Amino acid sequence: MNISSVAGRTARPGNAVYAATKWGIGGWSESLRQELQPDVRVMVIEPGAVATELADHITHADTKVAVEQFVKELAITAEDIAEVIAFAISRPRRMTLNEILVRPTAQP
């Protein structure tokens, strides 16, 4: 189970390095899936806005405020993502949910 981000499916100015790492997780996961099948299931969860400590590590004041406001208004919880992971891995071994994009309903 690999955790990526909705940023692995979109491109935004000022987000190039982060987006590149998330796009990379998707490609790496698909390669692993093909290399390790049929014995290993490889899955990617791509969360949107999740309430985490991320804003605590942002040093640019305007960006920090924007992220905090965005998360406060619409973020889902880490527990929500854990439930999705539990669902994905509980599927029968004969199937794999390769990619799951999970966003708050109100996230653009």
Ranges and model annotations:
Residues 5:
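Residue(s) in the substrate-gating loop at a strand-loop-helix junction
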Residues 10-16:
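Active-site loop immediately N-terminal to the catalytic Tyr-X3-Lys motif
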Residues 18, 26:
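Catalytic tyrosine of NAD(P)H-dependent dehydrogenase/reductases that use a Tyr as the general acid/base
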Residues 21:
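Active-site helix of classical SDR
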Residues 33-38:
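Alpha-helical segment proximal to the catalytic Tyr-Lys
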Residues 41-51:
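Conserved SDR Rossmann-fold cofactor-binding beta-strand/turn motif
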Residues 44-45, 64-107:
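C-terminal helical subdomain
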Residues 49-69:
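A glycine/serine/threonine-rich, flexible loop-to-helix segment
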